A protein has these predicted regions:
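Non-heme Fe(II) oxygenase catalytic core, chiefly the N-lobe of the double-stranded beta-helix
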Residues: 1-128, 141-150, 157-182
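Short, surface-exposed secondary-structure boundary micro-motifs
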Residues: 136-138
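Long, low-complexity C-terminal extensions of enzymes
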Residues: 183-198
Length: 198
């Protein structure tokens, strides 16, 4: 709402739309928040994300197996690097193929599973502007920032299906009103392509 022109330029990137539509189909809802980790910032514990990823193991166990299977299909997690991030700065740790572990929403808090994660995760250095998208059931955790002076900054994206429910509440009317003018102006003067507008 404070910088709609910047928002339009940032999120009009066709690559972001392509990743989101490939996972969720059209009419998805995007929420975003900046994650800033200063030098010395500690690593997160391995976890899964929304929806069931934020529940206790006991609460997750009350949902039938098909809900565990469906939940990660309703959301796409993403991140856009706002600075160069070498391995020392602690980019996100990922456990390949862990999204296939069906009881993962119940298991991720177990110490034996966390130990397995720490022994087998991978990390990818990112350059400013790089994006990463992944299934929210993939076990992941922000790494420890062991750098002396790099403030690791990532724009975390949570993209929800048109049939899902976003974790954050969004004032859609206010956002539409704020973006209408900049979108219309960029379209009228040719600074926005049809692919970017979509």
């Amino acid at each position: 709402l404070e910088a709609p022109e910047v928002f339009v330029r940032y999120f009009a990137t066709p690559a972001i739309d392509a990743a989101c539509e490939a996972w969720l189909g059209p009419n998805y809802q995007m929420t975003a928040q900046i994650n800033l980790v200063h030098p010395g910032g500690k690593a997160q514990q391995a976890h899964r994300d929304y929806h069931l990823g934020f529940q206790t193991a006991e609460v997750s166990a009350t949902y039938p197996a098909h809900v565990h299977d469906l939940s990660p299909l309703m959301t796409l997690q993403g991140g856009i690097a706002h600075c160069d991030m070498d391995l020392e700065s602690g980019p996100t740790k990922l456990l390949p193929f862990s999204q296939l572990y069906r009881p993962g929403y119940v298991a991720w808090r177990r110490e034996d599973f966390r130990a397995h994660f720490e022994a087998n995760h991978v990390q990818l250095p990112l350059s400013k502007g790089d994006a990463i998208f992944f299934n929210p059931a993939l076990f992941h955790a922000a790494g420890e920032n062991r750098s002396a002076d790099l403030r690791r900054m990532v724009n975390l994206l949570q993209v929800s299906s048109a049939f899902g429910r976003a974790m954050e509440s969004v004032d859609r009317v206010a956002i539409c009103k704020a973006l209408h003018g900049p979108l219309r102006a960029r379209w009228a003067d040719g600074r926005l392509t049809e692919a970017e507008l979509d």
